[in-house]
């Protein structure tokens, strides 16, 4: 990879699962590291697609706000992501599919076995443990 995906993956992780008063965001939980490790393995096609997605989002952010995606702040990042997912950005099929894949991998990283780089200190599991579940039917 010519440029590091780390800041981009960290931005995406915190957009998928933002930090709030209940706990850490996706980046602090390790979701970005999980995705980085997955892309470093035998998934070179996915790594190239994610780099192309980063280029697309950087270009869009520069066009609208004069800075790359990682530097425009959460509200603008969310706006760009939502535009792609809603097809408002007129993105090609591969861009949409890559963003969806990246979101899926990020969610995996929130709850994966910590040995794979995500779910740091089992924070994702602890968040799930605090959730209320509906009663089971008998």
Mark where each language-model region is.
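Mature-region segments of soluble proteins
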Residues: 6-18, 22-26, 30-138
């Amino acid at each position: 990879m010519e440029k590091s995906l780390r800041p981009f993956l960290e931005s995406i992780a915190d957009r998928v699962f933002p930090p709030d008063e209940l706990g850490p965001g996706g980046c602090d939980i390790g979701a970005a590291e999980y995705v980085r490790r997955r892309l470093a393995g035998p998934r070179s096609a996915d790594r190239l697609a994610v780099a192309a997605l980063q280029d697309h989002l950087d270009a869009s952010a520069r066009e609208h706000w004069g800075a790359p995606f990682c530097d425009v702040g959460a509200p603008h990042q969310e706006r760009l992501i939502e535009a792609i997912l809603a097809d408002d950005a007129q993105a090609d099929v591969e861009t949409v599919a890559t963003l969806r894949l990246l979101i899926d991998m990020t969610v995996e990283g929130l709850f994966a076995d910590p040995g794979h780089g995500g779910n740091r200190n089992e924070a994702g599991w602890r968040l799930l443990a605090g959730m209320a579940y509906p009663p089971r039917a008998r």
